[in-house]
Amino acid sequence: MEPFVITASECDCNSAHSSRVSKDGYALSDELSNETMFLTQVKYIFEGEEDHIDDNTMQEINTDIVNVVIVELDETLEIKNVELISDEYQLLGFSNDADNDLNLTILSEFPADVSPGTRDLGKLVTRYQHQNKHLKHMLQEL
């Protein structure tokens, strides 16, 4: 099986995040690099390959995990299902446009640092408009 690329792009930009990393863990450059967050410390664990996991490796993995993407493949290595386990993001959908590309559509949590006394009214209006777009998109996906 050739390495595949997982691309995660945030739906409607509450804060623009898009991530591209190769299966080998190398960040891929993008023309929108100023709006891009690259995945770091990528670990791969494959079902049935317990011999690659020792006690020292598991301690490393468990302390640094932020987001977990579970990709379920069938016997022909076709993607059957994708699941995202994260405190910060919700998976809205996925697509497999090319043989080695997995595109995830994600939605980030709303930031909770709203302090109306210290923010410009125009910025607050823009922020709530973005949040309303997110909520509408979530309701349509249900």
Curated annotation (Swiss-Prot):
The entry's keywords: Autophagy, Chromosome partition, Cytoplasm, Cytoskeleton, Karyogamy, Microtubule, Protein transport, Transport
Coiled-coil features, chain-numbered ranges: none
One Pfam family per UniProt: ATG31
One GO location term (cellular component): phagophore assembly site
Subcellular locations according to the entry: Cytoplasm, Cytoskeleton; Preautophagosomal structure
GO terms for biological process, alphabetical: autophagy; chromosome segregation; karyogamy; protein transport
Protein function: Plays a role in starvation-induced autophagy. Involved in mitophagy. Functions with ATG17 and ATG29 at the preautophagosomal structure (PAS) in order to form normal autophagosomes under starvation conditions. May be involved in microtubule function, such as chromosome segregation and karyogamy.
Protein name as catalogued: Autophagy-related protein 31
Native source species: Eremothecium gossypii (strain ATCC 10895 / CBS 109.51 / FGSC 9923 / NRRL Y-1056)
